[in-house]
């Protein structure tokens, strides 16, 4: 239950007979600092925080071993948090999220990129909230596609803490998107990165960074800011009520909905 940064520097390997698996239980925090662990079993977080200094592609040594990138090999349970604490890594590992609230955080000195574009796997039945958080303000990227488990078990997304996360998957979840702090960006300058037309409760910064045309028809509300940063065209068709600023840094922001209740200031950079 100790929530301080308990650290384990040992190299975790298979036992010579079978696979070793690692399970983080309880409400406390453990940080795995050895980048060369080679165990090939499942890493499970059933509670609290599991911090990792090193992430790598499936099959390569890392703080959570060298199991394959299959989603079944990294499981985050209700109330569990995977916290990246390293200097910057990219991984193609998938993961499985339980029903309830699960979290992925980036709080190292460098950003982390999950570049596996497959759909996130789910276990158990029930509503779920996926939280992306941490204090790292660099370009942390979630490439996996976030969807509902089914029509009865929908998913919502929360962006917590002061850091920045970029969604590059084309996400189909139908729950709300809640930006409680920091920055959430759709797209990383390419032609992917979107959310379904649900409600965005924005109390941070919502960014659009695509090179093509993206239409968003959901409601954007809250006191947060909106930023058009990509070279493409973003079309807002919802009746938005947010009170933060609207900043067009590049490309085109087109309003095809009722923006009269969006009361913040609007600025347009030269050339946008």
Please state what every model-predicted region is.
Residues 35:
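NAD(P)H cofactor-binding loop motif with strongest signal on the N-terminal glycine-rich segment
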């Amino acid at each position: 239950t100790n929530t301080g940064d308990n650290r384990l520097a040992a190299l975790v390997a298979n036992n010579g007979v079978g696979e070793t698996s690692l399970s983080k239980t309880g409400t406390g925090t453990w940080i795995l600092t050895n980048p060369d662990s080679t165990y090939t079993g499942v890493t499970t977080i059933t509670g609290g925080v599991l911090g990792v200094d090193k992430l790598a592609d499936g099959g390569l040594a890392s703080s959570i071993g060298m199991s394959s990138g299959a989603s079944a090999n990294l499981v985050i349970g209700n109330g569990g948090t995977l916290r990246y604490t390293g200097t910057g890594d990219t991984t193609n590992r998938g993961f499985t999220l339980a029903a309830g609230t699960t979290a992925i955080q980036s709080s190292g000195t460098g950003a982390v990129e999950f570049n596996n574009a497959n759909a996130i796997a789910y276990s158990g039945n029930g509503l779920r909230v996926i939280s992306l958080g941490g204090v790292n303000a660099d370009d942390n990227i979630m490439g996996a596609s976030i969807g509902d488990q089914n029509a009865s078990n929908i998913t919502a997304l929360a962006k917590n803490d002061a850091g920045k996360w970029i969604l590059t998957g084309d996400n189909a979840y139908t729950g709300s998107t809640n930006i409680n702090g920091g920055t959430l960006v759709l797209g990383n300058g390419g032609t992917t990165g979107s959310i379904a037309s649900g409600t965005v409760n924005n109390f941070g910064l919502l960014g659009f960074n695509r090179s093509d045309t993206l239409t968003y028809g959901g409601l954007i509300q809250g006191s947060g800011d909106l930023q058009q940063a990509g070279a493409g065209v973003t079309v807002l068709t919802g009746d938005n009520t947010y009170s933060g600023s609207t900043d067009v840094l590049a490309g085109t922001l087109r309003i095809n909905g009722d923006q009269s209740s969006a009361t913040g200031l609007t600025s347009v950079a030269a050339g946008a």
